[in-house]
């Protein structure tokens, strides 16, 4: 599911990875970065949610910190990295429990790391699968889908306008019963929970943006229809895979496959230049 945004923004990258089967080599020497931090914090929250501990218990914060210690030990981070990341997590721990406690009464079931089975996308005959960071089942056949974020990307606006459709597509899969852990449900809210460096935990619904609101169901179906249209386009053997169709930043040309697409060479020339 994570590659759907790539297919929109940089189709050539999907072509190189999935059709040419080219995979970028890992750097020989590289310190853990933002992606690894996000993975680690996700693992802590997943393990804590799966434990079934009531966040209203007096020892909930200590239990979360203990879970964090376990996950940090397993990650075996370089000392200088842990010296920055661990205090950041400690600042978050109390706020996470406060956020959990504020919403626990309305939750029937917490399903962390819920897996969506392969689901056919309309007439395209292609399938979509993936994971949701967390699904909170509510009464009356409803559920909230939560996506933890340790950074600022994607923005609420990018998700609402479907430039970054992953969370919304999870809503479409939920409606289609793709998540076996919870069964077919209607999405009530689609939200990022941002774990900020200053210790703030921000629950950010993507259902409203620029004074325009849509229901989770309507937004999910719109994303599903757009995905079907996109996949049908690429079923045409004559359809090309454009490089950097909708790049995040025009000036950045350090994508894994940008050198294969000769991005620098194609962007070096300007209007009016000739081969003379």
What are these regions (language model features)?
Residues 1-276:
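RecB-family 4Fe-4S metal-dependent nuclease core
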